[in-house]
């Protein structure tokens, strides 16, 4: 019997060093990849994050695994810092835990998601999103 989604989320987060929106900005300045898994509709409603690479959740592991033939060029090694974001910071925790299971030990997510970013008063991008198929 499944322990439920809340237990799954708690387990996923227990292995993450989650970042605040301001810590995320600092991590990206230091070279971390900022990965946005939101849908096009949600990005249209909330706006895009500066410097984020948009990757659909259904192909996230394939695009970020350095050993995958379908990886993005920025997926340069298992030691690369990756910060995953979603709308509110729930599915991003599950995604980051999956990336850690894959061997990307520095994968994490941002507390509060894009809504947390907006609440923190951080700027949204003025440029089109960097969407990776």
Located regions from the model:
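Short, surface-exposed ligand- or partner-binding patches at beta-edge/loop junctions that are enriched
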Residues: 85
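Rhodanese-like catalytic fold shared by cysteine-dependent sulfurtransferases
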Residues: 1-33, 40-81, 90-133
């Amino acid at each position: 019997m499944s322990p439920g989604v809340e237990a799954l989320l708690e387990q996923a987060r227990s292995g993450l060093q989650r970042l605040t929106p301001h810590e995320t900005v600092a991590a990206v300045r230091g070279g971390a990849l900022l990965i946005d898994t939101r849908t096009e509709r949600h990005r249209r409603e909330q706006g895009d994050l500066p410097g984020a690479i948009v990757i659909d959740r259904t192909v996230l592991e394939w695009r970020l695994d350095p050993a995958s033939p379908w990886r993005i060029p920025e997926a340069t090694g298992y030691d690369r810092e990756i910060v995953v974001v979603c709308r509110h910071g729930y599915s991003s925790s599950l995604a980051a835990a999956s990336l850690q299971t894959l061997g990307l030990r520095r994968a994490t997510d941002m507390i509060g998601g894009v809504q947390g970013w907006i609440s923190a008063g951080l700027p949204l991008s003025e440029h089109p999103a960097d969407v990776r198929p």
